[in-house]
């Protein structure tokens, strides 16, 4: 179930009706990921971000994609204006991983919140391919992801 309905952030409210089981950023949800040994998908943006709105319409409102994301990850939506520290930490990681950054900032992390993959806006098919490949790595070779996160 989407957990954003009671959030005060305009950005989080924009995503409250998405079929994705979004959670707001909290220590509790990070602890849940660790206890369930489930990967995190953290999506960071802000209410006036053009590409954030495009990604929501093309990807986050799509039931098929939401079903995959809900199965594969614990999904966290972050308003960068509410959590500039989280945005800064993961933007630094995205730049280290990919050489660039921007918003929406999408990060996949191990259950311990260490990032292993980052992207900004991706078209629908690229997004589906990426989350499917990440899921396969998690299923077949989680040790490779853990080694990569330690670098």
Language model segments and positions:
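Replace the tail clause
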Residues: 1-151
């Amino acid at each position: 179930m989407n957990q954003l309905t009671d959030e005060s952030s305009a950005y989080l409210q924009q995503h409250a009706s998405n079929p994705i089981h979004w959670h707001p950023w909290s220590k509790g949800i990070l602890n849940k990921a660790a206890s369930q040994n489930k990967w995190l998908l953290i999506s960071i943006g802000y209410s006036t971000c053009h590409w954030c709105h495009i990604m929501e319409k093309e990807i986050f409102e799509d039931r098929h994609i939401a079903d995959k994301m809900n199965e594969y990850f614990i999904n966290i939506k972050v308003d960068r204006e509410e959590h500039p520290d989280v945005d800064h930490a993961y933007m630094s990681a995205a730049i280290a991983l990919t050489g660039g950054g921007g918003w929406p900032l999408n990060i996949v992390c191990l259950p311990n919140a260490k990032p292993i993959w980052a992207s900004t806006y991706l078209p629908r098919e690229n997004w589906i391919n990426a989350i499917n490949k990440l899921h396969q790595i998690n299923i077949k070779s989680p040790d490779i992801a853990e080694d990569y996160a330690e670098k």
